Amino acid sequence: EIRLSLVGSEMCIRDRYTSYPTADRFTKEFGAEDFKKVLNARGTGENTADLSLYVHIPFCANVCFFCGCNKEVTKDHCRSKEYLEVLSKECELVSAEIGGNKEVVQLHFGGGSPTFLNNEEIFQVMDIIRSHFALAPDAEISIEVDPRSTPVDKVEVLAKAGFNRMSIGAVSYTHLTLPT
C-alpha cells in the first residue's frame, strides 16, 4: 500500500544519479588498454588533479526496495571475504599503473552498505588501501553508513580505522516510511 500522505512534497520526477560517470557513458569502445593509459597518465603528471578513490562494497544484509545501487543482499560474510581478496588484487593493479608519486586526498566507501563489513574486514580493507596508495595526512576518508545497522561501537571502529566522515543517506527519519 502506498501512503501518499507520507510522500507529500517529495512527489516529483528526478533523474537517477547513482554514479559518475553515469552508466550510460560506459561503452565497449573503451577497453582495458584505454583504462591503463588513463591510469598511467594520472601517475606521470600529465593530469595534476588531486587523486580520489571510490571503493564499492556491494553487500547489504537487507534489501531496501527504494535502492537502485549495485548490490548483493546476503548475510554470508564468505562473500565479502572473497570480494576483499579481489579488491586487493585490483588495488595492486591500479596502483602499479598510477605509480606511487600521487597522494590520495579523498577516499570514499559506498555501496551497498559498506558497514556490512565486520570490524575485522573494516581494518582489512583499510590495510589493503594503505598498502597500495599513499593517503594524504589530511585526506577525507568517508563511508556511507546504514543507520539501522551501525551501533555506536561500530562508529568507534570506523574512527579507529581512519574514517573521518560518515554519509547517512537517509530516505526518511520516520519509522512509518522506512520500517526496519
Which stretches of residues belong to each language-model region?
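Radical SAM/AdoMet-radical enzyme domain recognition
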Residues: 101-105, 118-178
